[in-house]
Amino acid sequence: MTDPEVFCFITKILCAHGGRMTLEELLGEISLPEAQLYELLKAAGPDRFVLLETGDQAGITRSVVATTRARVCRRKYCQRPCDSLHLCKLNLLGRCHYAQSQRNLCKYSHDVLSEQNFQVLKNHELSGLNQEELAVLLVQSDPFFMPEICKSYKGEGRKQICGQPQPCERLHICEHFTRGNCSYLNCLRSHNLMDRKVLAIMREHGLSSDVVQNIQDICNNKHTRRNPPSMRAPHPHRRGGAHRDRSKSRDRFHHNSLEVLSTVSPLGSGPPSPDVTGCKDPLEDVSADVTQKFKYLGTQDRAQLSSVSSKAAGVRGPSQMRASQEFLEDGDPDGLFSRNRSDSSTSRTSAAGFPLVAAQRNEAGAMKMGMPSGHHVEVKGKNEDIDRVPFLNSYIDGVTMEEATVSGILGKRATDNGLEEMILSSNHQKSVAKTQDPQTAGRITDSGQDTAFLHSKYEENPAWPGTSTHNGPNGFSQIMDETPNVSKSSPTGFGIKSAVTGGKEAVYSGVQSLRSHVLAMPGETTTPVQGSNRLPPSPLSSSTSHRVAASGSPGKSSTHASVSPASEPSRMMMMMSDPAEYSLCYIVNPVSPRMDDHGLKEICLDHLYRGCQQVNCNKNHFHLPYRWQLFILPTWMDFQDMEYIERAYCDPQIEIIVIEKHRINFKKMTCDSYPIRRLSTPSFVEKTLNSVFTTKWLWYWRNELNEYTQYGHESPSHTSSEINSAYLESFFHSCPRGVLQFHAGSQNYELSFQGMIQTNIASKTQRHVVRRPVFVSSKDVEQKRRGPDHQPVMPQADALTLFSSPQRNASTVSSNEYEFIELNNQDEEYAKISEQFKASMKQFKIVTIKRIWNQKLWDTFERKKQKMKNKTEMFLFHAVGRIHMDYICKNNFEWILHGNREIRYGKGLCWRRENCDSSHAHGFLEMPLASLGRTASLDSSGLQRK
């Protein structure tokens, strides 16, 4: 194929996978070597493929985002020559209210592949894309598909942000930035599309956070190419000159800007450079070398990659290397790759493995993301019955609030053992020293000479946190409370726990000093803790170097006492700007706003059966088939009593519930302005296995009385439709962006899955459609686990299944046990086992053959089998001692416990096609069959393994 055909093919693959893929995933779809693929992507240029890289402790991840210069014409009637596409964007997205038969009434063309459009696509080398793939590409490339941008938006940090009545329903972002032509180095308008308010508007218009993230990365790439690093030192008389430290829009919490702090000398000697803002970027000399990171993709020679980072580390002296260095918004050295600045869930690392500490700018308003207050909530249903229930859970993804990270104005430095510890810029140390008494400032000390200060929110009662940082499991550094046996309740009794689940610790530097707000238990006194007083690490900590943190509260005196491991654990809680209004917590550690990436969105079915045996399971383990969470920066937090929310959500009549003063909107999936999400088990149509814990979804349409009627059910004034919820759910999973035509009585309808709208083809009447699950309580879950009232129906045996499931008395088997079923010697199954057994052991007689029946293991086997691409089943024998029989029948084989040295057909286990054929010792030996759950009992003189 020629290059244009290859470019179109790569674009088609990317768009079929949502417009973005990692390089490894792309290589799995294309039969090309890595070096050749790199040359193709480089030849296509950033106007076709945006190349990104993110790094963490596991290494550097390279991603490819598809983009195009093709645009949709915005004119309703275009009479002049135009090189843009002429089509209806709502029809492309499946949301146009004009049906296919009435498309001539629409002012825009519904013929996506018209002769004129096909020529435009051919000019842009996109002629091989279908309508769905073209929609994915245009949505993330053409600003025309974004919601309307506020024309009176003046920028951040002003008294009047825009002239529209508040709250403004339009986007508050820089329009020039979305078009790729913003040339202001310090633009007053926001360039952050992942801002929570902007993201909420995007979601209302059908753009998911993943799509918005792709748009953000594409715009960042354009902005970086238009404003290269060489242009980032503006003239003093120009806008954004040296007399301005930075614009107010850059003071905000901006996920797309990088502020690189060079690491100090490993020896940690010498104070930081006093001149922070005047230091030259140590990476400036090697900015061009960043483009070479992808050049050696697929090669074994990494020396040149290492030289890039080593040059950055050695080009300056130790004093300069400690200084805070700064890039502009979206800044990164010129090159083939733009770093994914919005994704701060992983730390930026160089190709040689040295961490690049990303300091993200903070906005005072955006910083104060808090959790809705109140320990109890009022759930209001359609009957206005109020029931007070606990609001938020006392744990967040299994990590306690006392172990939440506390970050303030801390930087990072490299230590001898490779850990990252927090330091302050010298400018900030001086500014704090001028406003505080040295005896009332908490300090963090270590073996080096650098000292970090935390400033209390209450000037008269400063906090004394003694903490240290360590590398977290996801590659981020955090300051943790390290007192063992951490209490399970928060200081104020709300039972809220919080933790960072990913992302780099925020590093704040600048002219203004930011403060860490630390709250202690009522009645506690604050105590200074010296860094040398190291305590045993917390069980959740991954580092061995920790310090305990004690905190102060208003109105309490501070005492200078050392904290011992036996003292009361310190409780850390981040306060809102108005503590009287919000008594719960928020965390100042910014992480990636790609909130869909935090946590795993599918709940593990095996875990619900209490039988997940995978060490690194890629699914969410939870005790319910659903999980409601609230996103409060930087983590998802569980609601405490999820059954109340789930029960309301399952009722299609309920769109909004009020929990005290907080509003949960199921349509927008928000709690006030905070995003919420619902994790779930797979849909019942996704698995051929009829598992009792899959989610059953029901589909409803709203009539003229605003009442919801389930599809397939009759109503007093409407005829039942020919389709039901099961049919819609199956069609929805096979074509989630499609349009389904059906009829009910004499009326014909179209249902758009993307817009969730039902349209009457004749009258053009539109009805709202909702999809809600069937409510399952915790008692229902326990009952399904226990059985025997509910036993899942076994699938029909197919060509690849060696044996069908046995008939058994289900009442005699509990969900956690097994049963032996003796096979009749006239059964076909008995004959197959006997024939294979006697093929190598003719001199022995089979007394009985028993089959092991374990419902849990059988369901697990069937689910795994459905995911296999090459389904090859083998009938194997395995010899094991009687001592292990009960464990294996209950829990299946464990190669660590029951394995041996010979590995032939299974990891650590001796599997054989034929049975053993010689004897040396006498005994009675059983041979369980792992995959099918059967046992052959032999009365023999012993068996010897080859």
From Swiss-Prot:
Give the region (N-terminal domain) as residue ranges.
1-254
Q: Which residues carry this modification: Phosphotyrosine?
A: Y508
Record field: transmembrane: none
| BP term (GO), one | defense response to virus
What family does this belong to? Belongs to the ARTD/PARP family.
Protein name according to UniProt: Zinc finger CCCH-type antiviral protein 1
Annotated PARP catalytic domain residues: 805-946
Region annotation (Binding to EXOSC5) ranges: 224-254
Subunit structure as annotated in this protein's UniProt entry? Homodimer or homooligomer. Homooligomerization is essential for its antiviral activity. Interacts with EXOSC5. Interacts (via N-terminal domain) with DDX17 in an RNA-independent manner. Interacts with EXOSC3, EXOSC7, DCP2 and DCP1A. Interacts with PARN in an RNA-independent manner. Interacts with XRN1 in an RNA-dependent manner. Interacts (via N-terminal domain) with DHX30 (via N-terminus) in an RNA-independent manner. Isoform 2 interacts (via zinc-fingers) with RIGI in an RNA-dependent manner.
The record's domain comment reads: The N-terminal domain is sufficient to bind to viral RNAs and promote their degradation. The second and fourth zinc fingers are involved in binding to specific viral RNAs. Contains a divergent PARP homology ADP-ribosyltransferase domain which lacks the structural requirements for NAD[+] binding. It is therefore inactive.
| Post-translational modification remark | Phosphorylation at Ser-273 is essential for sequential phosphorylation of Ser-269, Ser-265, Ser-262 and Ser-257 by GSK3-beta. Phosphorylation by GSK3-beta enhances its antiviral activity.
Record PTM Phosphoserine, positions in chain:
S257, S262, S265, S269, S273, S324, S350, S425, S553, S583, S680
Q: Provide any one GO MF term from the record.
A: RNA binding
Q: What is the lineage of its organism?
A: Eukaryota, Metazoa, Chordata, Craniata, Vertebrata
Q: Which residues carry this modification: Phosphothreonine?
A: T277
Compositional bias (Polar residues) at which positions?
Answer: 466-477, 524-533, 554-567
On whether Cytoplasm is a keyword of this UniProt record, the answer is yes
Query: What is its biological role?
Result: Antiviral protein which inhibits the replication of viruses by recruiting the cellular RNA degradation machineries to degrade the viral mRNAs. Binds to a ZAP-responsive element (ZRE) present in the target viral mRNA, recruits cellular poly(A)-specific ribonuclease PARN to remove the poly(A) tail, and the 3'-5' exoribonuclease complex exosome to degrade the RNA body from the 3'-end. It also recruits the decapping complex DCP1-DCP2 through RNA helicase p72 (DDX17) to remove the cap structure of the viral mRNA to initiate its degradation from the 5'-end.
Q: Which UniProt keywords apply?
A: Antiviral defense, Cytoplasm, Immunity, Innate immunity, Metal-binding, Nucleus, Phosphoprotein, Repeat, RNA-binding, Zinc, Zinc-finger
- Residue span of region Disordered: 221-283, 302-354, 461-491, 523-570
Please give one Pfam family short name.
zf-CCCH_8
Question: Which InterPro entries does the record match to this protein?
Answer: ARTD-AVP, Poly(ADP-ribose)pol_cat_dom, WH-like_DNA-bd_sf, WWE_dom, WWE_dom_sf, ZAP_HTH, Znf-CCCH_8, Znf_CCCH
Q: Where in the cell is it found?
A: Cytoplasm; Nucleus
Query: Compositionally biased, Basic and acidic residues: which spans?
Result: 242-257
Q: Where is this motif: Nuclear export signal?
A: 283-290
Q: Where are zinc fingers of the kind C3H1-type found along the chain?
A: 73-86, 87-113, 150-172, 173-194
**Domain named WWE: which ranges?**
684-771
